[in-house]
């Protein structure tokens, strides 16, 4: 190989190495910032056959269970249970809760799964009013909780 070809080969290899390193870093960054959305039922039973792993970042939406809010009197730590129509999960949060946060209201929490049914949240968002439901919660609840289907025998039995 003559010196000109060696130099050209070196430049091409350097460009390919830089390009592959850039693509690898972009994919790594996207994977680190991807937060999957779950309802409490999907978190407990799995979503499309897969359960989230401990340490995974995720978003979870549901209703705050009445009587489940526990506040630490010496700090801003708060713990509460979240449910949809299935099992409930525990969310812990260290910070100031939104003004609209209260028991029986819908919220979306973003955090890390620390136990199979416990999330350590770093952000809690409350819904706007009693009629509002974030589109992703409504869609997830529609998929997970199909309306009850009654057979003809069941329908006839209820008429008697």
Swiss-Prot record:
Protein name from the UniProt record: Cytochrome c-type biogenesis protein CcmE
Ranges per topology, Periplasmic: 30-160
Binding site for heme: 128, 132
Gene Ontology cellular-component annotations: plasma membrane
Annotated TM spans: 9-29
Record keywords, A-Z: Cell inner membrane, Cell membrane, Cytochrome c-type biogenesis, Heme, Iron, Membrane, Metal-binding, Signal-anchor, Transmembrane, Transmembrane helix
Family matches, as SUPFAM superfamilies: Heme chaperone CcmE
Location of the protein in the cell: Cell inner membrane
Function comment: Heme chaperone required for the biogenesis of c-type cytochromes. Transiently binds heme delivered by CcmC and transfers the heme to apo-cytochromes in a process facilitated by CcmF and CcmH.
HAMAP family in UniProt: CcmE
């Amino acid at each position: 190989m003559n010196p000109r070809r060696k130099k050209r080969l070196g430049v091409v290899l350097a460009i390919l190495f830089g390009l592959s390193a850039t693509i690898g870093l972009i994919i790594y960054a996207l994977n680190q910032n991807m937060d999957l959305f779950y309802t409490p039922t999907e978190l407990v039973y799995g979503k499309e056959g897969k359960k989230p792993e401990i340490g995974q970042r995720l978003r979870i939406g549901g209703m705050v269970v009445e009587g489940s809010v526990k506040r630490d009197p010496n700090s801003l730590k708060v713990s509460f249970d979240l449910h949809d129509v299935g099992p409930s999960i525990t969310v812990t949060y260290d910070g100031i809760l939104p003004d609209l946060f209260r028991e029986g209201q819908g919220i979306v929490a973003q955090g890390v799964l620390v136990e199979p049914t416990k999330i350590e949240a770093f952000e809690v968002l409350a819904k706007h009013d009693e009629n509002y439901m974030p589109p992703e919660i409504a869609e997830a609840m529609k998929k997970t909780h199909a309306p009850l289907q009654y057979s003809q025998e069941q329908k006839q039995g209820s008429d008697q």
